[in-house]
From Swiss-Prot:
Sites of Phosphoserine modification: 190, 192, 379
Residue ranges, annotated region (RNA-binding): 29-160
Transmembrane segments: none
Annotated CoV N CTD domain residues: 215-331
Lineage: Viruses, Riboviria, Orthornavirae, Pisuviricota, Pisoniviricetes
Gene transcribed to yield this protein: N
Keyword Zinc in record: no
Protein name listed in UniProt: Nucleoprotein
SUPFAM superfamilies, per the entry: Coronavirus RNA-binding domain, Nucleocapsid protein dimerization domain
GO CC terms, sorted: host cell endoplasmic reticulum-Golgi intermediate compartment; host cell Golgi apparatus; ribonucleoprotein complex; viral nucleocapsid
Record keyword Magnesium present: no
Length: 409
């Protein structure tokens, strides 16, 4: 069963990700949610998960004897016109003696329950780990040191610095990303510069759709806080936040397209992969303080080196060529498209809006059967869906073996 020995393969995310921050609490709260994020089936009616290793998520707070529990199926639905629509199941992990099946002993047969245990676990014991209160604690990222679920399932990489006010869109950890095949797959999937930028832009768009909404007041605060702490809100131009683009001095990055689109321009996300963190700026830079009549000026000089062996080296060079001192220019592939013949004809006296061809009305699709569309979501289903923070397949930027490592967005 799932409690067998590891086969040598692993579904664990890339080992370059260093896990810091809080660990799962040792004692549970009054909530009844899983401490960990879910694994999700890729298709409807998928069989129950099988694990290459023990199937128990990593938790350094627990002894080996306590590393046992169960995965429980959670049916999922999303609202649709006239009712709800089923989506692939999610499976949540609970320690033995906790969660919705707290009354079961390890190994008891029940539909929608898969028991798992690490080697050396005392499956006769019951856990005091408790469950999670979603109002107080975020889901803890899944990590499997000895192998994850089979290829019918996926889970999303959650960075530990994710706040409660927003949701992260990051790399999906799935069976296809196993360690032995990672090096080969990186090279095959590195893609062209156009694909890289398109995927980067898609990440930003998805993050805006699924994340918490930014109010006008919040956007204004983001754009007008202390200059060195500003970020560009959605819908803002670069020069609205950081001033006009220039040449040969501070503020010289960004062409006209980037200035107009702001963070929607995928090149912004691509280049942020090379920008140092605040700690790197402070401790890895040459810092030069200088007293001026208006105050203290801090000059921070930092150099990021992108190896010529980096799969994205040419792409970064191209973006720099376009955007450094790029004011007044646009990418060659961003020339305005000529208007169609029908729309470019000069207006005449005989022209009238009434003569324009009306778009054909879409035929109404027949209503789905009762087994596909049911009533509105129940309160229990809404609660269950509330902890499903990643319903859609994430959009992944494959940076390859970049100079700074993987998954740095």
């Amino acid at each position: 069963m799932a409690s067998g020995k590891a086969t040598g393969k692993t579904d664990a995310p890339a080992p370059v990700i260093k896990l810091g921050g809080p660990k799962p609490p040792k004692v549970g709260s009054s909530g009844n949610a899983s401490w960990f994020q879910a694994i999700k089936a890729k298709k409807l009616n998928s069989p129950q998960p099988k694990f290459e290793g023990s199937g128990v998520p990593d938790n350094e707070n627990l002894k080996t004897s306590q590393q046992h529990g169960y995965w429980r199926r959670q049916l999922r639905f999303k609202p649709s016109k006239g009712g709800r629509k089923p989506v692939p199941d999610a499976w949540y992990f609970y320690y033995t003696g906790t969660g919705p099946a707290a009354d079961l002993n390890w190994g008891d047969s029940q539909d929608g329950i898969v028991w798992v245990a690490a080697k050396g676990a005392d499956v006769k014991s019951r856990s005091n780990q408790g469950t999670r209160d979603p109002d107080k604690f975020d889901q803890y990222p899944l990590r499997f040191s000895d192998g994850g679920p089979d290829g019918n399932f996926r889970w999303d990489f959650i960075p530990l610095n994710r706040g409660r006010s927003g949701r992260s869109t990051a790399a999906s950890s799935a069976a296809s990303s196993r360690a032995p095949s990672r090096d080969g797959s990186r090279g095959r999937r590195s893609g062209s510069e156009g694909d890289l930028i398109a995927r980067a832009a898609k990440i930003i768009q998805d993050q805006q759709k699924r994340g918490s909404r930014i109010t006008k007041a919040k956007a204004d605060e983001m754009a007008h806080r202390r200059y060195c702490k500003r970020t560009i809100p959605p819908g803002y131009k670069v020069d609205q936040v950081f001033g006009p683009r220039t040449k040969g001095k501070e503020g010289n990055f960004g062409d006209d397209k980037m200035n107009e689109e702001g963070i929607k321009d995928g090149r912004v996300t691509a280049m942020l992969n090379l920008v140092p963190s605040s700690h790197a700026c402070l401790f890895g830079s040459r810092v030069t303080p200088k007293l001026q009549p208006d105050g203290l000026h801090l000059k921070i000089e930092f150099t990021t080196v992108v190896s010529r062996d980096d799969p994205q080296f040419d792409n970064y060079v191209k973006i720099c060529d376009q955007c450094v001192d790029g004011v007044g220019t646009r990418p060659k592939d961003d020339e305005p498209r000529p208007k169609s013949r029908s729309s470019s004809r000069p207006a005449t006296r005989t022209s009238s809006p009434a003569l324009r061809q009306q778009p054909q009305k879409k035929e109404k699709k027949p209503k789905k059967q009762d087994d596909e569309v049911d009533k509105a979501l129940t309160s229990d289903e809404e609660r269950n869906n509330a902890q499903l923070e990643f319903d859609d397949e994430p959009k992944v930027i494959n940076w390859g073996d970049s100079a700074l490592g993987e998954n740095e967005l």
